[in-house]
Each structure stands twice: as C-alpha cells, then as structure tokens.
C-alpha cells in the first residue's frame, strides 16, 4: 500500500483466469510455498514469482545463507539427521507441513533414509552440530533478532539451513526463479 501497488488475491484454481483478465501482467506473484509447483506452471516465466516464506527470509534473515542451505539438500546421505524447526507453537494437524510433508518430500526427493528431529516455539536445541541440515519455517512469529540468532548458531556450527519456501522451490526445480525477486 505504501508503494501504491494494486494487490489482487485469488486461489490457485482461479489464477489462470485472473492473469488472463489483466491488461498488463503483474510485476510479482506471491504464493504459499506449498503451491509453488502449480503456480509456477501457470505464471509466465517473465513474471517474478516468490512466496511469503522467501520474503520472510529476505526480511528477517540471510537469504544467501538459506539459498546455500537449499543446495545442501543434494548432499544428504542415508541416516543424516535433519532438524525441522518451527518458530510458532500451532497445533499440529494430520498432514502438518513440518512434521509430515517436509520429511516425506525430502525422503522422496533424495531417495535417502533420513532421520528427523523437531523443535517448535522458543525451543531450539543448544547443540545442533550433529545435524546435516536445518529446515526452518519462515519465522513470522519471531522477531528479526531471534531469527538471526538461530541462523548465526547454524553458521557457527557449520550446519546448512534452509527455510520452508526455499526447500519447496528446490524440490520443484524453481529455486533460481524464486530467488530473483528484486
């Protein structure tokens, strides 16, 4: 609003029609990371695409570090330990993104037998050195200093970190596209 932008909200199933009805293409499409694959197939490659999670990484964290963490996904081996960290304390649902979807996607993508640990809210392990990767939520429920402290801890322990959005982009083959949002 401060930049005098016009925002249009729609569901994935109506996105094609919305784009067709615009006189000019949008400058940017922001989606939920879980819809990356479907949205990327609808939105022309000339239109910038990102997600709320990626924007949070840029706003509260170190986007370059998290992009590097996405590359670490390809280096995972059988029995590597992965920490899935969520900053909020929501009630987990049957098909929860952190405890169900991400482990399933990572196992399928890598073809490896991976071991997962989970943390939520203010809880973040003191010793993270045994993890080969940290997958962190976008951090919308914690402040910038808290998110950067977690990232600094990962950096000091030499443990790659990726956020949910970049993980979904990597797995769907659109990491480069979504990281070019400026």
Where do the PLM segments sit?
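P-loop NTP-binding site
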Residues: 1-182
